[in-house]
Amino acid sequence: MHQWRKHQQSSVHFVPTMGALHRGHGQLIKSVHGFGRLQPAAVLVSVFVNPLQFGPAEDFDSYPRDLEADCELASRSGASALWAPSVDQVFPGGASSHFRIQVPSHLQAHLCGASRPGHFDGVVTVVARLLALVRPEVLVLGEKDWQQLVILRHLVAQLGLPVRVHGIATVRDDDGLACSSRNRYLMTQQRQQALALPQLLARAARESQDGRAVDLAGLRCAWEQLGLEVEYVEKVDAFNLQPLHAGRKLCLLAAAVRCGETRLIDHTFLMSRQPIVAIDGPAGAGKSTVTRAFAERLGLLYLDTGAMYRAVTWLTQQHDVDPHDPVAVKTILENLELELEPSQSGAQTVRINGHDVTEAIRSPEVTSSVSVVAAHGCVRKALTAQQQRMGVRGGLVAEGRDIGTAVFPDAELKVFLTASPAERARRRALDLDNRGFPVPDLAELETQIEERDRMDSTREVAPLRQAEDATELISDGMTIEEVIETLIDLFRVQVPEEVWPTAGR
């Protein structure tokens, strides 16, 4: 492994498995080629049946092993290499001579953690060891083992491990059963019986969308009547894995059953609407550029709220309205028609009262007055109401100054995107030059930006501020692609692929 790793010029994406590879593993491998827009990666698949994650009465000895078939499937799916280390290679001197990692109790108090004591301690201990040996840039895991994925994300974050974690949606066979190495234990009749697991979970998810409460006892009874032995069926917070009783933006409905001697797990996510992303930050931080690209990458609707305020500012100038006079400004808001729609170029066309103002709203004249206009309560009330109507079904990303605090306070992901005044002045100069406008001195631009920050953060109505639950992202020194990739990583921590698939994957 050391020699192979030393000769890799590109980044390494690591897919750890216990072998007995199937379609689900194949999809993990293939998905690597759809990550981001950076240079191609080497894909390493490991096959290691981890003795630390099996209990005394579990199937370690009988777990299916077929290395030749695994090599064939991995190669066919696009893997660069397959590594099948022995226990001695992973734990020189024996596992007992190495440190063990203990998962925090709250992360394994429910679901599989409760019924398989010590299982996740064994998982994280081995994964940490494999990461140390492989040193990958990206760790690729399936969402099928959701509790495991959540725990490993906590491991990476809390230990500061230098690896990104990518989760891939559960892959299902044509009949709906989630792909699993243990499915091969099932006889034909048992497989038909096992289909009740995904079918009833899917039905519960549909009923939840219609506003009906999930009946955990009813699910258990239904499976038992069909001959399945229910180990657990629980509704938990999708991220802290604690039981839920009241409604929440996203929760996990998960179950484990036995069909004969075969243990099967499955889950579904319950969500009242599609996800919303709120990106706030000061002027010139690059919000529009990265948010537009981020939305396109994930297939989300891009809601440029800043353009809406700029359009109203442009309208005040066309009507010779004093931007400081809220009464006068309010008069032009009557019968306001504001449209945001994608154009063929991929940018967003902005129309106000039938006028295409896409370019006009980026002029220095509009920029110098937009903070004044946006500070009026009548303007913010009118536009916030429009924005919230656009977001009632979710499936969008919005950027502005108060998206996470006032417009969409229940957004799944909130990011405060910022940069130093000097960096923002440099970007503003480039933008003005590209648009054909005169470019002031950088020091003057920096002063203007600092004054804009002061005005935005001290206004009485919806001041610029970071939401308490927002993640701050300082973009100094980062390329646009790096910012987008960071946003995608943050999104995926909060929104599974199964809930909102990455566009084109």
Swiss-Prot record:
SUPFAM superfamilies referenced in this protein's UniProt entry, alphabetically: Nucleotidylyl transferase (SSF52374), P-loop containing nucleoside triphosphate hydrolases (SSF52540)
GO biological process: nucleobase-containing small molecule interconversion; pantothenate biosynthetic process; pyrimidine nucleotide metabolic process
The keyword DNA-binding appears for this protein: no
Binding, beta-alanine: Q53
GO terms for MF: ATP binding; CMP kinase activity; dCMP kinase activity; pantoate-beta-alanine ligase activity
PANTHER family hit by this protein: CYTIDYLATE KINASE (PTHR21299:SF2), CYTIDYLATE KINASE/PANTOATE-BETA-ALANINE LIGASE (PTHR21299)
Gene of this entry: panC/cmk
Catalytic function, reaction form: (R)-pantoate + beta-alanine + ATP = (R)-pantothenate + AMP + diphosphate + H(+); CMP + ATP = CDP + ADP; dCMP + ATP = dCDP + ADP
Protein name: Bifunctional pantoate ligase/cytidylate kinase
Lineage of origin: Bacteria, Bacillati, Cyanobacteriota, Cyanophyceae, Synechococcales
GO cellular component: cytosol
Key words, A-Z: ATP-binding, Cytoplasm, Kinase, Ligase, Multifunctional enzyme, Nucleotide-binding, Pantothenate biosynthesis, Transferase
Function: Catalyzes the condensation of pantoate with beta-alanine in an ATP-dependent reaction via a pantoyl-adenylate intermediate. Catalyzes the transfer of a phosphate group from ATP to either CMP or dCMP to form CDP or dCDP and ADP, respectively.
Annotated region (Cytidylate kinase), positions in chain: 269-505
Compartments where found: Cytoplasm
Enzyme Commission no: 6.3.2.1, 2.7.4.25
Domain of life: Bacteria
Entry-linked InterPro entries: Cytidylate_kin (IPR003136), Cytidylate_kinase_dom (IPR011994), P-loop_NTPase (IPR027417), Pantoate_ligase (IPR003721), Pantoate_ligase/cytidylate_kin (IPR024894), Pantoate_ligase_C (IPR042176), Rossmann-like_a/b/a_fold (IPR014729)
Positions bound to ATP: 18-25, 142-145, 171, 179-182
Family classification: In the N-terminal section; belongs to the pantothenate synthetase family.
Pfam families assigned to the protein according to its UniProt record, in alphabetical order: Cytidylate_kin, Pantoate_ligase
Keyword Transmembrane helix: no
Pathway(s): Cofactor biosynthesis; (R)-pantothenate biosynthesis; (R)-pantothenate from (R)-pantoate and beta-alanine: step 1/1
Active site (record annotation): H25 (proton donor)
Source species of the chain: Prochlorococcus marinus (strain MIT 9313)
Cross-referenced Gene3D superfamilies: HUPs, P-loop containing nucleotide triphosphate hydrolases, Pantoate-beta-alanine ligase, C-terminal domain
Binding-site residues for (R)-pantoate, renumbered to this chain: Q53, Q148
Main location: cytoplasm
